[in-house]
Amino acid sequence: MVQTWKFPANWSTSELAEGRVRSEQLFRKERKEEGPRAFEEVYREVEPRVREALEVTGDLLNLDGQAFIYDPTIWRILRYVCAPPVSEEDLWTLVGQKFRTVPADLCDETAEVIREVLDPVRFAWVAEGRQPNETERESAVMATSALLALELLRTRRRGTASKRQEAEVAAALEGIGYVLDAKRGDIDVLDVLERGHFSKERKVAGAKCDVPIRLKDGRLLAIECKVSNGPKNSWKRLIRECGGKSETWRQHFGTQVMSVAVLAGSFDLSCLERAQNMDGLWVYWQHDLKALTDFIETIA
């Protein structure tokens, strides 16, 4: 008997546009509700750490390797006294080694790298070789804390939003009788995951998959959860990240895998059409997971 596979429906342009509008509405509502309050909370969290960094380094006038011996994690704060702030990877490249805490033999070199790119606007007194006055110090603390809080808030938002998506997808699957497989090992062959089961954050054919699902007909449904904060960002999230993984999984499993992107936030309409029509992805929205579970329930 010839197996007839069922596939999700491709959405029309108007259907994609409708889902996109609703997703953006929810995104804006959430940002407005959490924005200032969330930023203030993170600012108040990091501001004492910025003050401590200035205190330990004598207002950056005595920034040397001893600062990292005193606190090997203070480099995460001191990245933000640079102009512009130095990313973790850039600092590792400049120092010549990746680290979580500064190794003792790299303390002096790390201090030198940071000294060479200190912000001359926020910390003008360093170049002038003098102590800052109270106004200068407070302005520098405020500006540096704001930079750090902004970056930390963005990072946390991405992580929190993704975890929330994964949790909602998992709840929806359990609601239709699928069972969570808590194992974390790689999925290189289909039978690693039982039919009617799903997992969270497992490598599938070498690429991390947010929610891999073994459908009841034996195929693998690989779900990626993506949040985009704007149309430009959506191309990176959907086409480059999801599209790249989709191709990897197709090469490994062939017709036995389907790739789905569960989306929230702001996405360019042409990006959605490209993903669906050219990159072998099926698109669903976080605000309408019933459409996804309705499809899964058609597969016996």
Question: Which stretches of residues belong to each language-model region?
Answer:
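Active-site metal-binding core of divalent-cation-utilizing nuclease and nuclease-like domains
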Residues: 182-216
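Short beta-strand-loop-alpha-helix junction that forms the active-site gateway
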Residues: 224-239, 264
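Surface-exposed cleft-lining segments at the edges of enzyme active sites
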Residues: 149-158, 194-199, 229-233
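Solvent-exposed, charged helical/coil patches
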Residues: 147-186
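Basic, amphipathic alpha-helical patches used to engage nucleic acids or provide basic targeting signals
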Residues: 234-254, 276
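Conserved catalytic cores of phosphodiester-cleaving nucleases, focusing on short active-site segments
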Residues: 211-213, 217-229, 242
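Domain-level recognition of nuclease-like catalytic cores that cleave nucleotide substrates
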Residues: 257-300
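Nuclease-adjacent, charged terminal/linker segments that flank catalytic cores
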Residues: 1-139, 148, 152
